[in-house]
Amino acid sequence: YPNTFWMNPQYLIKLEEEDEDQEDGESGCTFLVGLIQKHRRRQRKMGEDMHTIGFGIYEVPEELTGQTNIHLSKNFFLTHRARERSDTFINLREVLNRFKLPPGEYILVPSTFEPNKDGDFCIRVFSEKKADYQVVDDEIEADLEENDASEDDIDDGFRRLFAQLAGEDAEISAFELQTILRRVLAKRQDIKSDGFSIETCRIMVDMLDSDGSAKLGLKEFYILWTKIQKYQKIYREIDVDRSGTMNSYEMRKALEEAGFKLPCQLHQVIVARFADDQLIIDFDNFVRCLVRLETLFRISKQLDSENTGTIELDLISWLCFSVL
């Protein structure tokens, strides 16, 4: 299942020293890998059986040697075969195999046999000689565009549209925004949506509300409109099966297209928060996720002016940010 296999956790194994005793006459580094399912007794009491599990071991390409912050993509696994695999995928508590490989760097990828199975596990690696093991994951990055636009960017047609939508007060509230976006999405056949929830509209307004009015003026609405068009473009391009929705395994690529690189742990949280019980993410939840991420990254950047990677919050600040 290439669409989802690459989303599994990835572990770097660095084999540095060959075995001293080459019993079979073949040089290399001997090591054991054990993949163990956790909490299965508890799950069995709930009527769930063991998952069918196994793993693959891939040689790290020369151009990526020495890097630990790159989660290998779907394209890598489509173009590279496993150097070794577990003997079988089987529904046992532990899968254990012995291997011998030349010194070098390898990626270990555990997985269930069937896609979209969630499970807890631990991995044990024993080597005859010195070796190093660590998790491989993306560094946290956000490429944020400036939330600004000049008056010259806004054409007369958009000004007339805004005046028609905003009414006498020349501002758009979250409730008015919800009505506008519902009409827009109702005309689209390539995106399945019941419209935007009022919660999503509120966080969009909050992100761009520069004067604290809880409404959007002309320039603010123009910036938001531009963002929504960008989000629509990403959503359509990532929806490769043309279902009008997005599968959870497509979300990681979509976030990267939107400028966010996130570790696996955070991707798991995002899927749990924004996907439905069929692991589908609709356009409303996709936009809500992007807006929340952008808002949190901007807050972090503002509070961490020296780019240390840490921030300090007092209780009231934490509570205010938590209700975003």
From Swiss-Prot:
Residues where Ca(2+) 7 binds: 239, 241, 243, 245, 250
EC number(s) per entry: 3.4.22.53
Superkingdom is Eukaryota
Question: One MF term in GO for this entry?
Answer: calcium-dependent cysteine-type endopeptidase activity
Q: How is its activity regulated?
A: Activated by 200-1000 micromolar concentrations of calcium and inhibited by calpastatin.
- State which tissues express it: Ubiquitous.
- What's the record's note on cofactor binding? Binds 7 Ca(2+) ions.
Region entry Domain IV: which residue ranges? Answer: 158-324
**Entry protein name:** Calpain-2 catalytic subunit
